[in-house]
């Protein structure tokens, strides 16, 4: 796994994330300083079930399997986020592992990023919290074997 800062030049990449698309260019430039890029090869583990989580990854390229108790419960790709529940809940244990199935590139947002958003951009924090609640509900449905749209 390779990891590096995207710096303020990554502002447009942040705006491509649907949750952040309403931000101004200046807001994205400020937030980009707190974001890293991760690049992975197939088979590499991005997150491990049971580990403490303090980062979320928004996938830009590639795909990964979400694995819970040894069973693949979802496949994610560009535009999807993984690990955000632990970050939004200000830390917690990972509920699943995430393993790259193709070459993968994504943006890493930390709990520090979310703390800054909550302090400086409360309206955005509300949108993110609402999305997280929907994600939790989808996970609950998926775990109970019910269809998820």
Where would I find each of the regions flagged by the language model?
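Cytosolic regulatory regions built on CNB/CRP/Popeye-like sensor folds
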Residues: 1-149
């Amino acid at each position: 796994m390779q990891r590096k800062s995207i710096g303020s030049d990554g502002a447009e990449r942040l705006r491509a994330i649907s949750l952040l698309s309403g931000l101004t260019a200046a807001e994205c430039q400020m937030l980009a300083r707190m974001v890293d890029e991760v690049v992975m090869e197939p088979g590499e583990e991005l997150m491990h079930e049971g580990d403490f989580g303090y980062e979320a990854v928004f996938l830009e390229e590639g795909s990964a399997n979400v694995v819970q108790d040894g069973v693949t419960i979802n496949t994610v790709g560009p535009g999807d986020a993984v690990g955000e529940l632990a970050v939004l809940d200000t830390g917690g244990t990972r509920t699943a592992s995430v393993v790259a199935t193709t070459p993968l590139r994504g943006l890493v947002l930390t709990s520090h990023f979310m703390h800054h958003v909550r302090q400086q951009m409360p309206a955005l924090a509300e949108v993110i919290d609402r999305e997280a609640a929907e994600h939790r509900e989808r996970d609950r449905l998926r775990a109970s074997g019910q269809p998820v749209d």
